[in-house]
Amino acid sequence: MNTKLLFAALLCTTNAYASCGSSFCSVNTHWDTQGLVNDDTLRVDLRYSYAKADTLRGGSSKISPAQPAGSDTEIENLRTINQMLDLDLDYSITPKWNVAMDMPLVMRDHTHTFDSSISGPFVQESKFNGQGDVRVAAKYKFDSAEHHAGSGMSLGIKLPTGAIDKTMTPPDPANPTTPYALERSAQPGTGSTDMLLGAYYHNDIEDSPWGWFASGLLQSAVSTRDDYRPGNSFNLDLGAHYPFSPALTGLLQLNAQFKYRDTGLNANPASGGHSLNLSPGLSFVVAPKTNLYGFVQVALLQYANIDPADPGAGQLTAPWSFAVGVNHSY
């Protein structure tokens, strides 16, 4: 199948591994990295993803939250509901060169207990809808002597277009007139400019209905703001697809994610970690060049870094998530 490069970014993944549980479904929904679409001038993908982080984890184990004791600190004993709506545009300049842009809308509802020494423990909440960080990539497809296989790489940039000033209510009773800042890792944006390097390979097995792909993405902040640097991350996907009929295709992915700890004065030391997820899904052709698709992702392994100074302070994690979407080619 003749395909062109699509940026091998896991664009539905952002800010995974933070104490507030600001994670998203990490499934790969870029079809030409998987050899599932033909060359087209423009492709448009609209995707919704959902993850509810309500399991506190330290290392690979579930842990119990601290008990209120008037510590004037946050206790992550409740939940974070993460939703994202992604609009992904991919345009072919030449048969070998593409450009792509991802524009996310972040919808997040985070609650935790504030352990006040003045009023006693109470629930704080931050709920918002806001633009996330936009990503732009230039992509190149390598020549291949095999018509059933393809590979490529990409170089991109994540721009600091998302807000970093969201707050929680009510504020700290000790400072009732001062807005209480939401943790930086749970903001719509990171405030950083990141470089993105991706690569992929796909192969439709000869004399077989099966096809498979592998893709990876490295992300690293090169410019930061306000004493906060998100940790470097690496995502790796391995997947397979099988056509049940001309219109219905079964999908299966194994998604691995590795993220270093955030750093800076405004970073939470309880951040970063690694995970391995299994993601079965389906894609259905509803009209010429138009597909509907869906995935459910289940965590096989989750490891959440703890705060070295406070081993009892873990991170909220999501045991499962899902993504649904529609894509159309022109």
For the regions a protein language model found, what residue spans apply to each?
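Residues that define the transmembrane beta-barrel architecture of outer-membrane proteins
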Residues: 40, 81-85, 128-134, 149, ...
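Residues on the lipid-exposed face of transmembrane beta-strands in outer-membrane beta-barrel proteins
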Residues: 46-48, 87-91, 101, 136-140, ...
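Outer-membrane pore/translocation modules
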Residues: 107-230
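Transmembrane beta-barrel strands of outer-membrane/channel proteins
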Residues: 44-50, 101-105, 153-159, 199, ...
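Outer membrane beta-barrel transmembrane domains
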Residues: 57-59, 63-67, 222-330
